């Protein structure tokens, strides 16, 4: 039976640590000019319900560097856009391809695809979770902090898919996470409850960004209005007043803190230009590490590494 990568909570800490170690190894090999055709001749179907820059490019380049081929599929120009049942698509793609990555809206779409696919399914993003991005983020922290143990992580902004997945990561890896979200924009209640049961006291939630950021070693933020929420932009701008990660807020963190943002960034809204361009920013390393983290996931699921 194929193993999927749908959310972090499907994996143990040890399994995720092995994926991170492989990602770091693959990155080092690439930097030294080495090749690792671990998926030679294999094809990854890449289904996109949402527009994409980093997800598409990092998966397409990644499968190529592993010796395979990425096949881009837009739901709008395929039979999925005309109502073909997802379970039929899953079965057919499983006959043609060796793995499926999907970037979509509802988590239930990814779950249904995985239920009927006989090849690995990778969650490239849903409205609930963004596991590939968090693996890249944790990898970035390991590179710049030597690990994640004993660090305080802070999240400032919307309780979106990134926040939900950081909550999972904190509970699984065992680090402290302080989230600051405006009232009414908190993370998913079920995810919070799961983390509270899995790792009591590791995850805290406040409406005060200063409280969350104080003493933090890692600060993370994201856009206030995710894709599909554009109509809420003006309302959210009002609700998120005081939640911009600017120099004053970042100054409350540990002096040697690092700043992460999954991109795209709306400078002057959730993060200031000076912070994202500042000496504590590791945003570009983070973006690069999407490539390496996803290569490790693909190599493990599709190649049995």
Curated annotation (Swiss-Prot):
Gene3D superfamilies (alphabetical): Aspartate/ornithine carbamoyltransferase
Chief location bin: cytoplasm
Entry GO CC: cytoplasm
Catalytic activity of the protein: carbamoyl phosphate + L-ornithine = L-citrulline + phosphate + H(+)
Enzymatic class: transferase
Entries under Pfam families matching the protein: OTCace (PF00185), OTCace_N (PF02729)
NCBIfam families: orni_carb_tr, PRK00779.1
Name of this protein: Ornithine carbamoyltransferase
Source species: Pelobacter propionicus (strain DSM 2379 / NBRC 103807 / OttBd1)
């Amino acid at each position: 039976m194929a193993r999927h990568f749908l959310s972090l909570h499907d994996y143990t800490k040890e399994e995720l640590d092995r994926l991170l170690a492989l990602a770091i190894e693959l990155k080092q090999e690439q930097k030294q000019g080495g090749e690792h055709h671990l998926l030679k001749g294999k094809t990854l179907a890449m289904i996109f319900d949402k527009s994409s820059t980093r997800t598409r490019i990092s998966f397409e380049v990644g499968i190529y560097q592993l010796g395979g081929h990425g096949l881009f599929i837009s739901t709008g120009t395929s039979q999925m856009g005309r109502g073909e049942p997802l379970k039929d698509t899953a079965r057919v793609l499983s006959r043609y391809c060796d793995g499926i990555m999907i970037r979509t809206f509802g988590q239930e779409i990814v779950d249904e695809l995985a239920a009927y696919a006989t090849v690995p399914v990778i969650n490239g993003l849903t409205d609930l979770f963004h596991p590939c991005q968090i693996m890249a983020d944790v990898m970035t922290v390991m590179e710049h902090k030597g690990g994640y143990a004993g660090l305080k992580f802070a999240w400032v902004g919307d309780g979106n898919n990134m926040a939900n997945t950081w909550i999972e990561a904190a509970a699984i890896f065992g680090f402290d996470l302080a989230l600051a979200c405006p009232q009414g924009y908190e993370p998913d209640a079920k995810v919070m409850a799961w983390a509270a049961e899995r790792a009591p006291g590791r995850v805290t939630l406040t409406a005060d960004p200063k409280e969350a950021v104080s003493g933090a070693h890692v600060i993370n933020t994201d856009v206030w209005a995710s894709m599909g929420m554009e109509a809420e932009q003006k309302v959210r701008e009002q609700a998120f007043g005081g939640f911009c990660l600017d120099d004053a807020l970042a100054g409350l963190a540990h002096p040697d803190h690092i700043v992460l943002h999954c991109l795209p960034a709306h400078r002057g809204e959730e993060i200031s230009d000076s912070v994202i361009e500042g000496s504590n920013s590791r945003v570009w390393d983070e973006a690069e590490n999407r490539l390496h983290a996803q290569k490790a996931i693909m190599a493990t699921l599709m190649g049995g590494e």
